[in-house]
Design a protein with these regions (language model features):
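Active-site-proximal loop->helix
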Residues: 19-31, 51
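Conserved thiamine diphosphate
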Residues: 32-77
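Thiamine diphosphate
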Residues: 1-18, 70-73
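Short acidic/glycine-rich loop or secondary-structure boundary segments that cap or lie
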Residues: 18-19, 69-71, 87, 94-99, ...
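Short, hinge-like loop/turn segments at secondary-structure boundaries
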Residues: 25-29, 78, 103-106
Length: 183
C-alpha cells in the first residue's frame, strides 16, 4: 500500500473463515464463538479501513453486498483511481456467522455520502473508519490523488511494461547454449 501500486484490492469481509468450517478470521469480533474458539475470541479484530489508511492506501472504501449498486460504484471508483485502492466489502457468511448477518448490516449500514462526509479529510475518515455499532458507515472514506504511483516513480516499470512481456534480448544461439548447459 505504501508504494501506491496502481491496484484495486477488494476484501471479502465476512468476519469468519467459512471455507474452513467457521474459524475466526482477522476481522472476527472479540468474543465471537466459533468451532475453533468455543469460549469466544480473545483478540481485537483488525479494522481494514484505518489499517489501509495508515499503510498509505490512496483510495479506501467499504461496501455491503446487500447494496449492490452502491458497491459497484465503489469498485468502479477504485478501478478508475490511479493508485492503491482498498475496498472492504461486507459479505455475510450465511452458514457460520450468525451474529453479523445480512439483516444486521442492512439495519446498521449508512452511506457516508448521505452523512456529508469529506473523503479528503484524513482525520474525519479515520473517525468514521473506527465507527461500529448502531451505525456502520459504508462508502468512500478516504481518497488522495496527488501522490505518484510506483510505476511513475520507478522508471524501469514504465519502460515497456512487465519484464515477462518484453523481448528476451538474448541472441538465439546464446539462449540455446545456456539451456544446453543447464540440462
Amino acid at each position: 500500500m505504501r508504494r501506491n501500486v496502481d491496484l484495486t484490492y477488494i476484501v471479502m469481509n465476512n468476519q469468519i473463515y467459512g471455507l474452513t468450517t467457521g474459524q475466526l478470521s482477522p476481522t472476527s469480533l472479540k468474543g465471537m464463538k466459533t468451532k475453533s474458539t468455543p469460549f469466544g475470541s480473545v483478540e481485537n479484530p483488525v479494522n481494514p479501513i484505518p489499517l489501509a489508511m495508515v499503510a498509505g492506501a490512496t483510495y479506501v472504501a467499504r461496501g455491503f453486498t446487500g447494496q449492490q449498486k452502491h458497491l459497484v460504484e465503489l469498485i468502479k471508483g477504485g478501478i478508475e483511481h490511479k493508485g492503491f485502492a482498498l475496498i472492504d466489502t461486507f459479505s455475510p457468511c450465511v452458514t457460520y456467522n450468525h451474529d453479523n448477518t445480512h439483516e444486521f448490516f442492512k439495519q446498521r449500514t449508512r452511506k457516508l455520502e448521505e452523512m456529508g462526509h469529506d473523503a479528503t479529510n484524513f482525520q474525519a475518515a479515520m473517525e468514521q473508519g473506527y465507527r461500529w455499532g448502531e451505525v456502520i458507515p459504508i462508502g468512500l472514506f478516504w481518497q488522495r490523488g496527488d501522490l505518484p504511483t510506483l510505476d511513475q516513480l520507478e522508471p524501469v516499470l514504465g519502460d515497456g511494461g512487465p519484464l515477462a512481456h518484453r523481448p528476451l534480448g538474448v541472441a538465439p544461439e546464446l539462449a540455446r547454449a545456456l539451456v544446453k548447459e543447464l540440462m
